[in-house]
Amino acid sequence: MAKKNTTHKPLTPAVFYILLALSTQESHGYEIMKRVESDSQGKVKMGPGTLYGSIGRMIKAGLIGESDKKIDPTMDDERRIYYKITGLGKKALAAELERYSEILMVAQQKRIFPNTFAYDI
């Protein structure tokens, strides 16, 4: 019997940061963009094209989905779509964090530390 492949492919920076932003709460697009910038300490600025293109691909891949939660229209724009991370998305994020942890361990063993960088995606 063939062993089931449970390994997740490495994530793009955009997908990683979107999953990270959704890991603690459901959010709409603009809020995700702001959380990406905050989570990266201002080093990653995600534009709407990258965000919504990535969201579409992530929904198709089953990493995120639209939230069933209805927002109070008096508190928020009812046209906003909120997104949530799925079980598969949580597993993919955990696998990516494990990869990063392994890379960091190797870099620490080699006494290699990255320079500060900033980029747009």
Residue ranges of predicted features:
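Exposed loop/turn and edge beta-strand positions of beta-sandwich/beta-sheet ligand-binding modules
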Residues: 79
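Beta-hairpin "wing" of winged helix-turn-helix
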Residues: 61-76
